[in-house]
Amino acid sequence: MCSTSGCDLEEIPLDDDDLNTIEFKILAYYTRHHVFKSTPALFSPKLLRTRSLSQRGLGNCSANESWTEVSWPCRNSQSSEKAINLGKKKSSWKAFFGVVEKEDSQSTPAKVSAQGQRTLEYQDSHSQQWSRCLSNVEQCLEHEAVDPKVISIANRVAEIVYSWPPPQATQAGGFKSKEIFVTEGLSFQLQGHVPVASSSKKDEEEQILAKIVELLKYSGDQLERKLKKDKALMGHFQDGLSYSVFKTITDQVLMGVDPRGESEVKAQGFKAALVIDVTAKLTAIDNHPMNRVLGFGTKYLKENFSPWIQQHGGWEKILGISHEEVD
C-alpha cells in the first residue's frame, strides 16, 4: 500500500518549495518517461537499456569535448541495439563501476515455472500500489505545463545513463538463475535469499544494500521484475526507505564510479545523471507515494550537486544542452 509512516516522513519533509525545484521536476519527469515504460503487470523481455555506447563512445572522447559531441545512441533505435565489446574501454559501464561478473548455469524450466507462479500471487496488489504511487507524480506534472528545460535535461540524462551496457541477459528474455557479482568484497546472488556470511545483523544489512546497488544497474522494468521475484529482499523494506538508507545506497553507487581520464565536468555530469536514475528506480522499492523518494533525490542533489552545477553554468551547460534543444 502507499500508506505513509509518520516517523519516516518527519525525517525528510517534502514541502511545496521542493515540488517547485528544478531537481524535483527533473526527477519526476525522468521517472515517468524514461524508467518505468510499461505497466507493472506487463513486462517486455526486450532490454530497455541500450547495449552499448556509440562507435565513438565516451571512452574515446577527450577531456575537453562536451556531451553534445558524443554521438549518444537513441535508446529505441535499431542501431543502438547492436552489441559492441567495450570490455577494454575505461569508460564502459563495468569500468565505471569496477564490477567483476561470474556466470552460472541457467535455471531449469521447473524452477522458472515455480518462480513465475510465486510472482503472480502478489502481482495484482503490487500493480495497484504502483498505479496509485505513479499517480502522485502524474498529478504534479499535470498541474502545469512541463518546462521544456526540464524535458531536455531529463532526456539528456536518459541518453547518458542508458548508453552503458546492462547486465547480460539470456536470448529468451529471462535472466540466469545465478549471477554472482563481487563488489567491494561482498558476494551475493541476484535472485533468492541473500547469503549471510556472519550472524551479525550489520553484515546482513550491508549485503542487502550491496545487492540493491547491483540491481539498480538493470532497466527500471527489469528491476521491478526482479524485485517481484525476491520477496525476501522486499520484506526488508516493508516500512519503506528512510533517507539514511537512500543516501547509503546512492553513496555506494557513486563510489563505484571511476572518473579517471574524464574531465571534472563529465565526471560530475555523469554522477548527477546517475543519482537521478538511482532515485527513479528506488521508487520501486519504497511502499510510500513516489514523491517521497523523489524528495530524497531532490535533497541529495541539492546538497551534493546543485551548488557545483550552478557555479559551472547550470544543468544545460554541464550536460551540453544547446538553446536550440531546449526551444
From Swiss-Prot:
**Which GO BP terms apply?**
apoptotic process; positive regulation of extrinsic apoptotic signaling pathway; regulation of apoptotic process
Q: Which UniProt keywords apply?
A: Apoptosis, Cytoplasm, Membrane, Phosphoprotein
Tissue occurrence = Isoform 1 is widely expressed. Isoform 2 is testis-specific.
* Annotated GO MF terms: protein kinase binding
Q: Give me the Gene Ontology terms describing cellular component.
A: cytosol; endomembrane system; intracellular membrane-bounded organelle; intracellular organelle; membrane
Motif BH3 positions after renumbering to this chain: 212-226
Q: Which PROSITE patterns match?
A: BCL2_FAMILY
**Post-translational modification Phosphoserine, affected residues:** 44
Instruction: Give the domain of life.
Output: Eukaryota
- What is known about what this protein does? Plays a role in apoptosis.
Q: Could you identify this protein by its name?
A: Apoptosis facilitator Bcl-2-like protein 14
Source organism per entry reads Homo sapiens (Human)
Its lineage opens with: Eukaryota, Metazoa, Chordata, Craniata, Vertebrata
